[in-house]
């Protein structure tokens, strides 16, 4: 079977299976992206989480980081208030940790070129920790990830280590990150639509035109005069995150010019 | 110029340049890995940070997440004690955030196959957020990243929001994560050595042998009888992290068999 047919078969097989997540369905905020991707023959999504605030409990001691002993006290895909956390914390007698986790999306791609397009969209939308995985036999996946998290230990052996005022302050930050994450998801959707439209146009155009067109797309510095580049906003650069390459604290040698 | 010669030229150019990081040199814990990679013709490192505890100050309000207003109050590549943070916090009149950031390493690779080998080594060593980037003209980079972070807001508009006891508790966790990160770096170095040795052996062996050998390497489930697979320890799986695919909270459809 050729690669194209093989991918098609896998996709059909994957999408016909039940959703094995605890929730059992795709998160509301990411449904449009999942549908857009699964509607294209070169992609299918294998896992997704739109972003969430979670309160985890780890065994009896967070210094013994055993995954087996971890349970969830609270999971919310919507903004939370202090009382949600206070109530959930009552169930904890180990070490409770509050986390904000941004969008995570895994997409299987027919070929490397498809993953590259999706990767550009992800980076341009602010998901800077995204990356491609290529398996030994060529299975190509894109993981969409952000650096925009939060991970705060709250209690130790059942004892609350912070004040209620602090939890309130923390949730304001977590909710704000959730909003920012939502904006990025919207940006991702818009960028993706443009990229896929462009892809369709170039696929149908003359081969020479196609090459020319390809070389012009996904410029890091967008030309404000070009409507199709508008998804690359400067907003991305204003948000504080672990932007590794810009970070003066990381040992850096000059990159050769982009090729 | 062919790709091989082009890569060689870029590498020479990159490694001859000064280190533009604030520190001006490669972190001690990652020197061996950097040297091992740069000693191979198919790789060169472009940035690295072994892992660190940092105290950042963000403008006057962490809800206005402007990167421009961010400054560093403390950076440590070694374990910290409470007083280090207390002293540094005295300089803050905005919003201070304590972070633990694990190893970050960017490696430019001659071809995709080289990045795949390095990616396997990274994943097997516990750096699960690692990923490949392929530029429009084929520039291939591997980013080594872990999920093993910590990000805790400590003060708001200059006011400390937590107790000293909490800071002490937090640093125990951060220091523990630093230790775990160090173990993973060692694991990465050992795995990398084995992978590169194997690569050399297979490159020099008969082509048919080479293919056979390649298909046997980097098994997820290692065969305990085989010495060359010993770098894949079960330890990795015990550590609590955002292991996206295992997470029952993430909408998941069945992966087609690895190919």
From Swiss-Prot, chains A, B:
GO terms classed as biological process: tRNA methylation; wybutosine biosynthetic process
EC numbers on record: 2.1.1.282
Gene3D superfamilies: tRNA wybutosine-synthesizing-like
Alphabetized Pfam families for the sequence: TYW3
Stretches the record annotates as Disordered: 200-259
Stretches with biased composition (Basic and acidic residues): 200-216, 226-241
Gene Ontology CC annotations of this record: cytoplasm
Function field: Probable S-adenosyl-L-methionine-dependent methyltransferase that acts as a component of the wybutosine biosynthesis pathway. Wybutosine is a hyper modified guanosine with a tricyclic base found at the 3'-position adjacent to the anticodon of eukaryotic phenylalanine tRNA.
Name recorded for this polypeptide: tRNA wybutosine-synthesizing protein 3 homolog
Taxon lineage: Eukaryota, Metazoa, Chordata, Craniata, Vertebrata
Gene name of the record: TYW3
